[in-house]
Amino acid sequence: MMPVDVCPRDRGSQWVWLEMGQCYSKKSVVPESDTSERSSMTSGSSESDIPQENKVSKASLDTGQMAFTLAQLESLEICLKEAEEKAKALSEQLSVSEGTKSKLLEQVSRLEEKLEAVDHKEASGGPYEKMVLVKDQCIQKLQAEVKASQEQLIAQKLKHEKKVKKLQTDLATANAITVLELNEKIKTLYEGKPAPREDSLLEGFCGGLPPVEEGDRKISLIMELSTQVSLQTERITQLKEVLEEKERKIQQLEAERSPHPPQEVKDPPGCLPEAPVFSTHDIPPVVSDENL
């Protein structure tokens, strides 16, 4: 509220009260010739009118001041209502902002946790990658060994089949020669003639040896061939066992590699035992008819 003062009266001036609560003075200029007359004429009446004028001016001042005060109160009430509405809207906006801030803080905390988990995973991924690399190297080595063993086994099988076929042919030939000799001996015994010392078939096959020595040599040849066949069969069985063992190890490593979590590598890349590799030099040569 603006202060309202009652304007005083000065000598030679008149104060006027306006609606806005301010006082202004209006000076009146009187000529010098009329001053003495007017003062003498109005001296008596002015002294009697002063209290009445003061009452009227005070009443008018009180009425204007009251109206001005009421207008100010109404304007202040309107301003107060507007301020309350603005404060209410601001409080609502503040509550919404607080809720948004809490949600953002929760999102930030979740993102920080995810970032820490990713950092931890990257930090712990080094040993796992090394272990996977070592296992891959072991698997590749085993696969190469299995491939070499398979190739060697196939070659040994082919060679063994050839030797078996040759032995079967030689055995059939020896049996046929023995049957022919026995038939000749039986025939000569029935006819009563002495058995010939040499035969054309025996000369071509045995080089003219006596029948008794030739039969012993055939028997020894058959025994030696049977021994070689049994040795080769044992070697082939051993190669098959080694191949099956390597395949089991490869399957075990592949099963450990894919579904399970990373584990510590206890053995170096050379942890797996070396599989025995059989060469063709270990197999004894087959005695054929050309060596006889």
Curated annotation (Swiss-Prot):
Keywords: Coiled coil
Coiled coil (UniProt feature): 65-174, 222-258
Biased segments, Basic and acidic residues type: 251-267
Domain of life: Eukaryota
InterPro entries noted in UniProt: CCDC192
Compositionally skewed regions (Low complexity) per UniProt: 38-49
Disordered: annotated span: 28-55, 251-292
PANTHER family in the record: COILED-COIL DOMAIN-CONTAINING PROTEIN 192
UniProt-recorded name of the protein: Coiled-coil domain-containing protein 192
Gene assigned in the entry: CCDC192
